[in-house]
Amino acid sequence: MDLSSLLSQIPQDTLLVLLAYTVLGGLYLVVVPLALYAWMNQRWHRMGKLERLGIYGMVFFFFPGMILFAPFLNFRLSGQGDV
């Protein structure tokens, strides 16, 4: 059984729901967490109190996606070089 015949047996409403879940899941687990990482990396030392509070709230809300990328991203400071 090939993919086109399998997809033709599934109702269109079900396919739309699966597409919506995929898009929302991708936004929740990939797009927004990467945007948050980029925003925090760019503005870490210039954030105001309210901006930092909002970013921390979004980190709490998007924590599953943040934890997926945490092992692969390194935002440590460069340091003084060889001492």
Curated annotation (Swiss-Prot):
It is a multi-pass membrane protein. Its EC number is 7.1.1.-. Keywords: Membrane, NAD, NADP, Plastoquinone, Quinone, Thylakoid, Translocase, Transmembrane, Transmembrane helix, Transport. One of its GO terms (cellular component) is plasma membrane-derived thylakoid membrane. Its main location: membrane. It holds the Pfam family NdhL. It catalyses: a plastoquinone + NADH + (n+1) H(+)(in) = a plastoquinol + NAD(+) + n H(+)(out); a plastoquinone + NADPH + (n+1) H(+)(in) = a plastoquinol + NADP(+) + n H(+)(out). The chain crosses the membrane at residues 15-35, 53-73. The keyword Thylakoid applies. One of its GO terms (molecular function) is quinone binding. InterPro entries: NADH-quinone_OxRdatse_su_L. It is found in: Cellular thylakoid membrane. Belongs to the complex I NdhL subunit family. NDH-1 can be composed of about 15 different subunits; different subcomplexes with different compositions have been identified which probably have different functions. NDH-1 shuttles electrons from an unknown electron donor, via FMN and iron-sulfur (Fe-S) centers, to quinones in the respiratory and/or the photosynthetic chain. The immediate electron acceptor for the enzyme in this species is believed to be plastoquinone. Couples the redox reaction to proton translocation, and thus conserves the redox energy in a proton gradient. Cyanobacterial NDH-1 also plays a role in inorganic carbon-concentration. This is NAD(P)H-quinone oxidoreductase subunit L. The gene is ndhL.
